[in-house]
Swiss-Prot record:
<protein>
    <recommendedName>
        <fullName>Putative protein YgeP</fullName>
    </recommendedName>
</protein>
Length: 99
């Protein structure tokens, strides 16, 4: 999700793009322009990194839950970010190898 938001943010920064102009116009018509604002996207990206970093710091697997807790899982989205090659600009290979 965070990687997708970063890609969307990068795409929207291309102000000379006809696609971006059309997308932003349609977003405004449908009252979704705030959702695509740079401020909102950056906030969501930052929140995504907060979650990923926290989960990686806790080991990447069902962080925060004991094995006996019904919420405990054997795999987690944070760990998926280590395995699946998403291009997260703030998480490098060295950081992933620390898990």
């Amino acid at each position: 999700m965070t990687s997708g938001l970063e890609r969307l943010s990068n795409l929207l920064s291309k102000k000379d793009s006809v696609f971006v102009s059309d997308l932003l116009r349609e977003a405004k018509v449908n009252e979704l322009d705030e959702t695509l604002s740079t401020t909102r996207l950056n906030h969501l990206i930052d929140k995504g990194y907060e979650r990923i970093t926290l989960q990686l710091d806790l080991g990447g697997e069902s962080p925060g839950y004991l094995e006996k807790d019904k919420h405990y899982r054997e795999a987690d989205a944070a760990l998926l970010n280590v395995i699946y090659p998403t291009n997260l600009s703030k998480i490098n290979t060295r950081r992933k190898e620390q898990v």
